[in-house]
Every structure is written in structure tokens, then in C-alpha cells.
């Protein structure tokens, strides 16, 4: 139960409070963008990770709900939901650089590769740009087709 409370605090309460701190200024300007980086796992589920999936799913729900609440103030709220992105925290270089290990890691990804951090950065830049002004309440999976 303490682990669940900690996960909810980090993945739901903190983003909620951060968004709440920014919204008054955005409302004054009658414009703004809030972009959460969540996870693709709630879009599909993941055995043995129900606590994480639940917390991340709540963050996705927060994005959709805030989009409904804040749209009238010209504030767009979206979320990028990555999974299977190259990162030494999740995929150590010794595994990524080993063809057998990489094949095992990517076997469930339709595109058969890991995403690159710069691809996530480009997606974030798009959502932060004027090109995304008519997009709100969207959860964008970034998982090579896995979710």
C-alpha cells in the first residue's frame, strides 16, 4: 500500500499540482500548452505491473480531463505515452548492442526496434509548437505500434 501511495504521489499528484501551478497564468494569457510524458503501458496493460499501470493511467486520464476543462481558455493539454525507448536506465548499452538481446527486447514491437530519444524530443517539440494548436485531450502512444 505504501508503494502504491508513493507511485500515485509521484505520477499523479505531482503532475496535477504542477499543472495547477501553471494554469492561472495560462488563463490570464488565454493560451498555453501542458504536455505530460506518461507511458504506453496503460493503453495495453502489463502483467505484474498493475500499480505502475494504474498510476500512469491516472496521469493519462488527468490529461484528457484537463483538456476538457481548460479548452475554453485556449489551453491545450496532451500526453505522450512512450514505451520501448532507448535509455540506459531501461535498456543497458550492452543489451542494446547485442543482436540477440535486442531481438528479444523488440520481438513484441511491430516496428522491430527501440525508439530513439531524439524522436521523443521531436514529438515534444511538435506538441509545443503552433502546429498542434488544434490538438487537445490526446494521448499519443510512442511505442512502435506496441500500444
Q: What kind of region is each of these model predictions?
A:
Residues 72, 84-108:
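A glycine/serine/threonine-rich, flexible loop-to-helix segment
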Residues 1-16, 31, 35, 52, ...:
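Catalytic Tyr-X3-Lys loop
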Residues 76-86, 128, 141-143:
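Conserved SDR Rossmann-fold cofactor-binding beta-strand/turn motif
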Residues 44, 125, 136-147:
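Short C-terminal tail/terminal secondary-structure segment
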Residues 109-120, 131:
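A conserved structural motif in NAD(P)-dependent oxidoreductases
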Residues 19-20, 64:
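A short, exposed helix-loop element centered on a Lys and neighboring polar residues
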Residues 24, 68-72, 133:
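Alpha-helical segment proximal to the catalytic Tyr-Lys
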Residues 33-58, 63-72, 84-85:
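Catalytic loop of short-chain dehydrogenase/reductase
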Amino acid at each position: 500500500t505504501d508503494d502504491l501511495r508513493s507511485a500515485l504521489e509521484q505520477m499523479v499528484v505531482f503532475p496535477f499540482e504542477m499543472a495547477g501551478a501553471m494554469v492561472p497564468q495560462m488563463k490570464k494569457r488565454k493560451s498555453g500548452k501542458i504536455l505530460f510524458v506518461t507511458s504506453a503501458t496503460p493503453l495495453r496493460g502489463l502483467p505484474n505491473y498493475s500499480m505502475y499501470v494504474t498510476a500512469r493511467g491516472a496521469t493519462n486520464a488527468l490529461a484528457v480531463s484537463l483538456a476538457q476543462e481548460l479548452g475554453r481558455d485556449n489551453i491545450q493539454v496532451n500526453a505522450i505515452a512512450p514505451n520501448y525507448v532507448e535509455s540506459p536506465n531501461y535498456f543497458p548499452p550492452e543489451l542494446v548492442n547485442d543482436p540477440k538481446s535486442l531481438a528479444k527486447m523488440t520481438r513484441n514491437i511491430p516496428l522491430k526496434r527501440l525508439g530513439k530519444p531524439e524522436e521523443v524530443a521531436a514529438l515534444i517539440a511538435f506538441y509545443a509548437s503552433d502546429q498542434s494548436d488544434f490538438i487537445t485531450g490526446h494521448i499519443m502512444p510512442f511505442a512502435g505500434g506496441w500500444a
